[in-house]
Design a protein with these regions (language model features):
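Glycine-rich nucleotide/cofactor/substrate-binding loop typically near the N-terminus or early
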Residues: 56-59, 63
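Catalytic cores of alpha/beta
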Residues: 11-15, 64-77, 123-138, 162-164, ...
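N-terminal pre-domain/capping segments
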Residues: 1-24, 29-36
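Hydrophobic faces of well-ordered beta-strands that scaffold small-molecule active sites
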Residues: 3-7, 24-26, 52-56, 88-90, ...
Length: 232
């Protein structure tokens, strides 16, 4: 089983390397669910020597995108491939909550040669079995999911069904609310291909500044506790 850190800061990138994570999902603005990071941040992570999978998401909110947004996403995918990212993390749905196969295939064509993860947009899908079949047909490498629920604990029954249904045809990575209290159970009962978590805490950035913001900051001790609990 592999471990993926959701890294939204330079500190998180360095910690992932220090603690020997298998890979990172690189993003920015984790407080809004994450958006595509800057070129400088992507290049920093790659140069730091960790497998970097870049989130391709032009804005917060849902996953039904306009033509202009799709154009930006295609440019971002090509850019990530050209500068050496190991993979990309994407998700695109129709207005009715189905995977947009046509746009997904455009993304897959641009991403040819690197890995592709379909993120938790999957948890917004109307029919998860049909959606998984589409992703398998489109040769997506893995799905990140909380089992169609707010968090992995609530979604464990569906995650179990997903892993059985996938039958090794696509990787299933669990994520969403993973912590030291539940990771051991996830590992033991589900045996997913990978577990994804951020290990962050709320923090008031630059609290004496006029521009102070509440952010999610990586917490080394919390990350270490989660990793340790996975081995129990």
């Amino acid at each position: 089983m592999k471990f993926e850190l959701c890294a939204a800061s330079l500190e998180a990138i360095r910690l992932a390397k220090e603690l020997n994570f298998d890979r990172i999902e690189l993003c920015q603005n984790l407080e809004q669910g994450g958006i595509t990071p800057s070129n400088g941040m992507i290049e920093y992570a790659i140069a730091y020597g960790i497998d970097t999978h870049v989130l391709i998401r032009p804005r917060p909110g849902g996953f039904n995108y306009s033509e202009d947004e799709v154009e930006v996403m295609l440019r971002d995918i090509l850019n990530c491939k050209e500068i050496g990212a190991k993979g990309i993390v994407i998700g695109v749905l129709t207005e009715s909550g189905e995977i947009d196969r046509e746009i997904l295939m455009e993304f897959m064509e641009k991403a040819k040669g690197i890995e592709v993860t379909f993120h938790r947009a999957f948890d917004d899908c109307f029919d998860w079995k049909k959606s998984m079949d589409i992703l398998i047909e489109c040769k997506v490498n893995r799905i990140l999911s909380s089992g169609l629920a707010r968090n992995v604990e609530i979604g464990m029954p569906i995650l179990h069904e997903m892993i059985e249904y996938s039958c090794g045809r696509i990787e299933i990575m669990t994520g969403g609310g993973v912590n030291a209290a539940n990771i051991g159970r996830l590992h033991k009962e589900l045996e997913p291909d990978a577990i994804h978590f951020s290990g962050t805490v709320k923090f008031q950035q630059d609290e004496d500044s006029l521009f102070s913001e509440s952010v999610l900051r990586i917490d080394k001790a919390r990350v270490q506790r989660i990793l340790a609990a996975s081995k129990v």
